[in-house]
Amino acid sequence: MCDEEVAALVVDNGSGMCKAGFAGDDAPRAVFPSIVGRPRHQGVMVGMGQKDSYVGDEAQSKRGILTLKYPIEHGIVTNWDDMEKIWHHTFYNELRVAPEEHPVLLTEAPLNPKANREKMTQIMFETFNTPAMYVAIQAVLSLYASGRTTGIVLDSGDGVTHTVPIYEGYALPHAILRLDLAGRDLTDYLMKILTERGYSFTTTAEREIVRDIKEKLCYVALDFEQEMATAASSSSLEKSYELPDGQVITVGNERFRCPEALFQPSFLGMESAGIHESTYNSIMKCDIDIRKDLYANIVLSGGTTMYPGIADRMQKEVTALAPSTMKIKIIAPPERKYSVWIGGSILASLSTFQQVWISKQEYDESGPSIVHRKCF
């Protein structure tokens, strides 16, 4: 790295995982849970030089004695003190950089409240003294990562799902739909249906085990009813999973019943439309002239779109809703778990982007509201 060329930092703060690294890299250097843990009981670890809080993987590994909290709920920061701890951990422990020496690109959920963008801006400039920063919308970055500037992004992470139509690089706010159904809800639902099978998972620590079961064994059925029939008549769909204590459990139709809730939110007692219908509804809120371009560029993004079978099922469901002659294409990049971060890395390393950063000087002159003028 030559001296005059300082790499920008790219931090994608998800509800479940924080992805961080350097602009120009093709993958994030650090990926850790967006968790802050505090000891449940005072002084149980005598002589351990006990800290009053733990972040990320360390909180995860000590989860037995901690109470875990996620500062980002449904994609939006709700606890700023904890959020600051996560950023501090990102810069100093994970990336090992001095934030006052690097421009920082942060990501935000679509329709993020204005006050939140201002608070992010304020913390970056006042707490971390960054020389420059920018806030980009997550779904737009995913679209860039797929090499497009027009399309509709179905972005589903741990805390929230959005359908975001984007035309020539601009998100169309009137047509963005938010669905408060994502990975965390699916983990909770899997906990519930495994309980019905006689396995008990209740604590925050056990929830992480169920999340692992979900990530390793779940898939989306192309035809739910048919899959249920197959599961009932044979054991061909059953898989076993070994718990940390050595006990082995069997998972059957739960494997596809869990992510089916994405298409049928009524499974979770929610009245909202499924992800296929939300995608369709979002497209229908757009100008009739651009719908064709959106149908042909449906881009999946985020960890909750990683289930095997989800792209085929989306293709089938959207085709059933759309006009019969419409060409429909679902794009599911293999790296879509990190495509928001990758898009940020691409954006922050473009030469044309360098004049777009909000500088410390601009912030000092205008205050936090500068973010609304500079970041669309």
Swiss-Prot record:
This is Actin-1. Residues 1-2 form a propeptide. The keyword Cell inner membrane does not apply. One of its GO terms (cellular component) is cytoskeleton. It is found in: Cytoplasm, Cytoskeleton. InterPro entries: Actin (IPR004000), Actin/actin-like_CS (IPR020902), Actin_CS (IPR004001), ATPase_NBD (IPR043129). It catalyses: ATP + H2O = ADP + phosphate + H(+). Belongs to the actin family. The keyword DNA repair does not apply. Pfam families: Actin (PF00022). GO terms for molecular function: ATP binding; hydrolase activity. Gene3D superfamilies: 3.30.420.40, Actin, Chain A, domain 4 (3.90.640.10). Keywords: Acetylation, ATP-binding, Cytoplasm, Cytoskeleton, Hydrolase, Nucleotide-binding. PANTHER family: ACTIN. The modification N-acetylaspartate is found at residue 3.
